[in-house]
Amino acid sequence: MAKAFVFSLCLLLVFNGCLAARQSQLSPQNQCQLNQLQAREPDNRIQAEAGQIETWNFNQGDFQCAGVAASRITIQRNGLHLPSYSNAPQLIYIVQGRGVLGAVFSGCPETFEESQQSSQQGRQQEQEQERQQQQQGEQGRQQGQQEQQQERQGRQQGRQQQEEGRQQEQQQGQQGRPQQQQQFRQLDRHQKTRRIREGDVVAIPAGVAYWSYNDGDQELVAVNLFHVSSDHNQLDQNPRKFYLAGNPENEFNQQGQSQPRQQGEQGRPGQHQQPFGRPRQQEQQGNGNNVFSGFNTQLLAQALNVNEETARNLQGQNDNRNQIIQVRGNLDFVQPPRGRQEREHEERQQEQLQQERQQQGEQLMANGLEETFCSLRLKENIGNPERADIFSPRAGRISTLNSHNLPILRFLRLSAERGFFYRNGIYSPHWNVNAHSVVYVIRGNARVQVVNENGDAILDQEVQQGQLFIVPQNHGVIQQAGNQGFEYFAFKTEENAFINTLAGRTSFLRALPDEVLANAYQISREQARQLKYNRQETIALSSSQQRRAVV
């Protein structure tokens, strides 16, 4: 009897332990019991040498529900955002500016190579200088010969000097040839770089390192979404950035104790007392904070076949710079020249490719040969008004991006949407069928309402430029642009996210029979017909004020 009791007790403990573990795994889903949402600006800021990184507190309930984290990166002119990778897939939207982005795929070849012509330009300049020196030497020798006519001894000395000079020139020429050959062998090669500009959406898989550089004439601003609940993230749901250079600070507070940006501007104790860089304690220790920093210096030097001084530079020892550094001079690397005609040609190619995909449909997507791993297309521009998928001359326009027009999103299971609404324009009330929506306000303002399953408005707020808010899956939402118009970008946590509308020509109400509407809402059949057919627009709706203004 006692043995049976002990066995039952052990079995109960094991069962409870398994149940607790299962509940901990499902905790992100249980975080979606939300009573209130809020649109807000970033909670934390890290000041860097050539820019800043701002992050939203991912421990807030709405971020935990959506399984995402977000940051905003500002890179000043001639600033370099150092290479890093993340434990979660990223979707990046370029809000402002232009620059260059490079993504490193392990095992792929370096397809960008410095031409021999560019490397020979430097040698030609050196040879030109040598010729000028030889001409000057020849003139000096001629003058010496005129003087040597008066004295035989002087002529003999002159001949000896000329002979020695020729021998030195021959020796220098022989030494120069292997140096030129060595320079030819050491031409710069690297993986593909991509031009980025306002309106671009860039997809970065988990674990893929990337860097970015601002070579434009204004600040480069980007908003990053980290899909931490993705299947590609095998760690916990804390966003992690692994930097491969510099002495970076932690962008996301793992303890969830977010510091207001106002405090960051005034300086947090031991962290922001300097204009940029690591805390003073770590600076005194001379330890870096990138991936190389944790390795033994001697072992790292042996692995890379370099001296220990170079290894210490990789580790960021005694380096006070963090994530974004200022480039001295210009950043010179191999990239194809781009003129106006090339940009127009690239845009036409993208439009043609998109039309072909729409015509061929899923057959092109399923053959598995459209793109190789090393040539994945990572970006698509959805800022061009001509690219709009939905347009109303009195309300605004909406552009969507999914796995059909950017195939890598099928792998990341993300999609995006960009909208621009005129003054008082309305985004039809709707719900997201299969995704959460993370909305960033690019410009303007709007009134936004979000309703939960109990009919409660858990968000009723006027959102402003620079704020971000989350609309959970299946929650009803309506947006109306303010006096300044409303321009936004929305990250969607599904590769082909779609919505169901509550108003308009393709709405839920339009699909119901008249009698169902009349009985469901206690209205007459005539009123039901008006409810169904009064609105002929689809998603971008003009307000009554706009219609009166047109009349």
From Swiss-Prot:
Gene Ontology MF: a single term: nutrient reservoir activity
Cystine crosslinks: 32-65, 108-374
Biased composition, class Polar residues, residue ranges: 282-293
Tissues/organs with expression: Expressed in seed (at protein level). Expressed in seed.
InterPro entries, per the entry: 11S_seedstore_CS, 11S_seedstore_pln, Cupin_1, RmlC-like_jellyroll, RmlC_Cupin_sf, Seed_Storage-Functional
Keywords of this entry: Allergen, Disulfide bond, Metal-binding, Seed storage protein, Signal, Storage protein
Signal peptide: 1-20
Bias-annotated ranges (Low complexity): 114-124, 132-148, 168-185, 254-275, 351-360
Superkingdom, taxonomy of origin: Eukaryota
Domain Cupin type-1: 37-312, 380-529
Any one annotated GO CC term: extraorganismal space
Binding site for Ca(2+): 194
SUPFAM superfamilies the record matches: RmlC-like cupins
Disordered: annotated segments: 111-194, 238-293, 329-360
Residues spanned by motif NGXEET: 367-372
SMART domains, per database record: Cupin_1
Record field: temperature dependence: Thermostable up to 77 degrees Celsius. Complete thermal denaturation at 90 degrees Celsius. Thermal stability decreases in the presence of a reducing agent, dithiothreitol (DTT). The acidic and basic chains have lower thermal stabilities than the native multimeric protein.
Composition bias type Basic and acidic residues, residue spans: 339-350
PTM characteristics: Proteolytically processed from a single precursor to produce an acidic and a basic chain that are linked by a disulfide bond.
Subunit composition and interactions: Hexamer of two trimers; each subunit is composed of an acidic and a basic chain derived from a single precursor and linked by a disulfide bond.
Family: Belongs to the 11S seed storage protein (globulins) family.
Job of this protein: Seed storage protein.
Name this protein carries in UniProt: Prunin 1 Pru du 6
Organism per entry: Prunus dulcis
